[in-house]
Amino acid sequence: MRNENTSEAENHPQSNLIPHSTFHIPQNNSPEAQIERLLVQAIVRDGEKVIYEGIETEDGQTINLTVAQYIAYDLGLDGLSFHDDRYNQILSEAAAHSGEDGFKAEEYFKRHPDIAISSLAADLAIDRHQLTPGFQPKEREGGLRQRVLHLVLDFRMDIIEKRLKEIQAQLKTVGSDMERMKQLLEEFRDTQQIRDALARQLGNDVIR
């Protein structure tokens, strides 16, 4: 997909960087899980809002992408998903309903027939409504898109960092199996390159 009005980095949401069967989604209350929650919070609060306009598809059509659609598209490139089934359901439904007249993700999920979904949505939305309307911060132009892009990159970076640690641990136990060691070293090098590319997009300096 291509957008004539955005930079090259934004024209191409994250490409196929992460091997499908290689990385694992966090299963506990870790920094990775917290980033997942922030992503789902963005979907619940702003899932219906358009952050990309005039995206050109392969067949020459143009479409707009909402927050939910962008996240679903980006994670779908590498078959990534959240560790919590509720999160995946929220993303799937928000992406499916985006573009429908009158759809508001927050109200939709707070009224969801599944109590597990509606309770989670209410929890994710609650701190927004603790502020009176006059004191609620306004999203600067382009701010929502940049926040969502950064969260998606953080999500991918955490997966990559975890995999690097896993490879390092495996290298310590590989013993005299030189073929396996070679495979692990090659994967470590490739994964480092992915990490460095993500770090550049995030504006981070990676210390080797």
Summary of predicted features, one role per range:
Residues 3-102, 106, 121-134, 164:
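Non-catalytic protein-protein interaction segments used by genome-maintenance enzymes to assemble
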Residues 14, 76, 85, 89-208:
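Bacterial replisome coupling helices
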